[in-house]
């Protein structure tokens, strides 16, 4: 089949996160191993075309002329046979029933489309008009195209997707290895109270790079369906804890608000997410996203963590207790210097928990120093 096509054209409202969620759900429905994908492959092998709307409402009904009402259970073989007829098929949104067959769809001709073939133009316009996914099977080009609210995605063979996914997975493994190195260095520097803005931005940069490549691989997993099971397991193992770590680093180091500069944790995470791939490679730009000025002098200036990240590594320590400990002591160095009695002064921290925190922090401090110098 043809290469993956990710071209996007302006559509109706519902773009952004909602549109991405609909595309992901639609790709899952047509992924290998699903009954709908089996039916679409049968249409291709039979050298016929097809136009299938994955949902029915008054808007879709208003575009339908001719054809006949079926309301029968969906099967891959029925889909194949009914696509021999001229016209489109209408399925229910759960894709469990074939509602109509042989339908001529007449969408508003004023809806913009950049497609050229009649079937593809109709599919694009119908998806934009009704908001339901529409699948177009091209007989001449032998490809399956999915249209979701202005976005077109060409479905590929699993082998082609797996090839790209394995390359991305190898990249993720390298990124994760480098992330572990800089995160370990940061932990040791935190214990010694020698952290600079440069050290923090290096970790934030690597966390964001890992998150982005993982998101790309997750899309491949969706497109692969049952063929992506092993890839999904590998991905889950590699990125375990990355997303919480990303937030913890920002919570530890986002600057205190001032009259000139103020940034919340959520804003800093959003700024990091908004950086282009080129911007992400520049440490000063990453520093600005975190709320620092980004100047060379700032990158080398000393900063101290609040302690969220290290406390999160202490076993069986609830988030609410971590919040209270950070608020009470105000920084990691004071936490490291606190005795069991000092820790017990915090609301909700009894003797047993205080000893657990004290011992946990001591073990983390020792292991971090050993990893760096041994």
Curated annotation (Swiss-Prot):
This is DNA integrity scanning protein DisA. GO terms for molecular function: adenylate cyclase activity; ATP binding; diadenylate cyclase activity; DNA binding. Its cofactor is Mg(2+). GO terms for biological process: DNA repair. Its EC number is 2.7.7.85. Participates in a DNA-damage check-point that is active prior to asymmetric division when DNA is damaged. DisA forms globular foci that rapidly scan along the chromosomes during sporulation, searching for lesions. When a lesion is present, DisA pauses at the lesion site. This triggers a cellular response that culminates in a temporary block in sporulation initiation. Also has diadenylate cyclase activity, catalyzing the condensation of 2 ATP molecules into cyclic di-AMP (c-di-AMP). c-di-AMP acts as a signaling molecule that couples DNA integrity with progression of sporulation. The rise in c-di-AMP level generated by DisA while scanning the chromosome, operates as a positive signal that advances sporulation; upon encountering a lesion, the DisA focus arrests at the damaged site and halts c-di-AMP synthesis. Homooctamer. It comes from the Bacteria. Belongs to the DisA family. Pfam families: DAC (PF02457), DisA-linker (PF10635), HHH_5 (PF14520). Keywords: ATP-binding, DNA damage, DNA repair, DNA-binding, Magnesium, Nucleotide-binding, Nucleotidyltransferase, Transferase. Residues 20-158 form the DAC domain. It comes from Streptomyces griseus subsp. griseus (strain JCM 4626 / CBS 651.72 / NBRC 13350 / KCC S-0626 / ISP 5235). It is an enzyme of class 2 (transferase). The keyword Ubl conjugation does not apply. ATP binds at residues 87, 105, 118-122.
């Amino acid at each position: 089949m043809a290469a993956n096509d990710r071209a996007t054209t302006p559509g109706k409202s519902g773009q952004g996160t909602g549109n991405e969620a609909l595309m992901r759900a639609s790709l899952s429905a047509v992924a290998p191993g699903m009954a709908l994908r089996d039916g679409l492959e049968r249409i291709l092998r039979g050298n016929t075309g097809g136009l299938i709307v994955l949902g029915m409402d008054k808007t879709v009904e208003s575009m339908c002329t001719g054809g006949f009402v079926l309301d029968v259970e969906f099967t891959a073989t029925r889909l194949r046979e009914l696509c021999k007829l001229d016209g489109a098929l209408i399925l229910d949104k759960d894709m469990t029933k074939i509602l109509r067959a042989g339908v001529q769809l007449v969408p508003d001709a004023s809806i913009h489309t950049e497609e050229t073939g009649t079937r593809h133009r109709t599919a694009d316009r119908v998806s934009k008009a009704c908001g339901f996914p529409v699948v177009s099977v091209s007989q001449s080009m032998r490809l399956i195209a999915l249209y979701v609210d202005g976005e077109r995605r060409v479905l590929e063979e699993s082998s082609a997707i797996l090839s790209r996914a394995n390359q991305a997975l190898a990249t993720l493994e390298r990124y994760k290895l480098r992330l572990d190195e800089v995160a370990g260095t940061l932990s040791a520097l935190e214990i010694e109270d020698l952290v600079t803005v440069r050290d923090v931005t290096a970790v934030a940069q690597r966390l964001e790079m890992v998150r982005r490549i993982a998101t790309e691989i997750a899309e491949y997993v969706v497109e692969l369906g049952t063929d992506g099971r092993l890839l999904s397991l590998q991905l889950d193992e590699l990125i375990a804890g990355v997303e919480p770590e990303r937030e913890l680093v920002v919570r530890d180091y986002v600057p205190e608000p001032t009259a000139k500069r103020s940034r919340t944790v959520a804003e800093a995470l959003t700024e990091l997410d908004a950086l282009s791939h080129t911007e992400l490679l520049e440490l000063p730009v990453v520093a600005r996203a975190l709320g620092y000025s980004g100047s060379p002098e700032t990158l080398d200036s000393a900063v101290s963590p609040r302690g969220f990240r290290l406390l999160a590594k202490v076993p069986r320590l609830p988030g609410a207790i971590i919040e209270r400990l950070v608020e009470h002591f105000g920084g990691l160095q004071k936490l490291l210097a606190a005795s069991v009695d000092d820790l017990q002064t915090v609301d909700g921290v009894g003797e047993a928990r205080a000893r657990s925190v004290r011992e946990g922090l001591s073990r983390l401090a020792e292991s971090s120093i050993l990893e760096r110098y041994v």
